[in-house]
């Protein structure tokens, strides 16, 4: 849980939390997948792939939900973006609140953002808007919702969810990133700089 929270909010060193979970239970497939995702986002691709392959091996006899979760992570690392995205969409139809499956789909560097497809910003927004009724007051999801709205020009629609994110989790780096985007797109650059100057000094990396 700790590693997932750190990873989804871009806080420092989530891989260390996943390592502790693996030390406590070496056969915990989702911890290996989480570690793989964290390592991949830190550009440690070979280590990430090894961790994901271990997760796949350990997930073989687990329920479909866990297997699918691990597979999305591994396909993303292996470069199978189209397959990863298709699997993620199918997974989210059944398990709409699985954050570790949704996360790779979101953001400008996600499976949708990097697809190169026309209308990808609207596609990302449609996905999160469809999932919104399942999520409630969750800072990870509110960040994704706000970002998708900013990217489609709905600045005011993004304001409430990102403000709520930072109320719930003031040190969320993803939340701070989206808030900075919102200020920029709204033309409030002075306010955006003030926000960042206040937020950044305590961020570890």
Label every PLM stretch briefly.
Residues 1-20, 24, 70-80, 114:
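Alpha-helical segment of the N-proximal tetratricopeptide repeat
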Residues 6, 39, 75, 109-112, ...:
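Residue at a conserved register position within TPR or TPR-like alpha-solenoid repeats
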Residues 7-10, 25, 59-62, 94-95, ...:
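Alpha-helical junction/boundary sensor with strong preference for TPR arrays
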Residues 9, 42, 78-79, 112, ...:
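Structural motif corresponding to the intra-repeat A-B loop/turn of tetratricopeptide repeats
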Residues 17-20, 48-59, 82-95, 118-133, ...:
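Alpha-helical repeat scaffolds
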Residues 27-30, 62, 98-101, 138, ...:
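Residue-level recognition of tetratricopeptide repeat
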Residues 32, 66-68, 102, 142, ...:
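Canonical tetratricopeptide repeat
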């Amino acid at each position: 849980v700790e590693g997932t929270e750190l990873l989804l909010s871009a806080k420092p060193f989530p891989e260390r939390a996943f390592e502790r979970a693996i030390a406590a239970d070496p056969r915990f497939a989702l911890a290996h997948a989480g570690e793989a995702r964290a390592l991949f986002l830190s550009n440690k691709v070979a280590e990430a792939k090894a961790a994901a392959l271990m997760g796949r091996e350990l997930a073989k006899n687990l329920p479909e939900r866990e297997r699918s979760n691990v597979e999305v992570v591994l396909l993303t690392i292996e470069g199978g973006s189209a397959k990863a995205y298709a699997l993620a969409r199918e997974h989210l139809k059944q398990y709409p609140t699985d954050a570790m499956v949704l996360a790779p789909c979101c953001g400008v560097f996600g499976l949708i953002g990097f697809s190169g497809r026309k209308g990808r910003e609207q596609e990302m927004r449609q996905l999160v808007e469809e999932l919104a009724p399942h999520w409630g007051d969750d800072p990870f999801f509110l960040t994704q919702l706000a970002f998708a709205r900013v990217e489609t020009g709905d600045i005011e629609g993004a304001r409430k969810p990102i403000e709520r994110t930072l109320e719930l989790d003031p040190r969320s780096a993803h939340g701070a990133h989206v808030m900075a985007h919102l200020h920029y797109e709204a033309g409030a650059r002075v306010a955006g700089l003030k926000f960042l100057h206040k937020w950044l000094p305590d961020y570890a990396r």
